């Protein structure tokens, strides 16, 4: 196997690795975005319109208590997801760089 064939094989492997890293990054980004969307939804409650004002206030207080608990849980998930997303982003960037360098080397040999 000559140098051209070796670089060709190496670029194929590098491309597969890049594709895998990009899929992992996409999955992490979608999970993180879902948590961000859930947080945004918690900030937009739809107030009941046909209730007595005292009952509506009680409903609002209970909703806020529940929403605060959900925010706490979502924020824990979001912190983990953000760390995973940052790691996946770094890994994808490295794979992209390696693939680009191998492509340039292959171009010089051809």
Predicted regions and their residues:
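Charge-rich amphipathic alpha-helical interaction elements
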Residues: 1-110
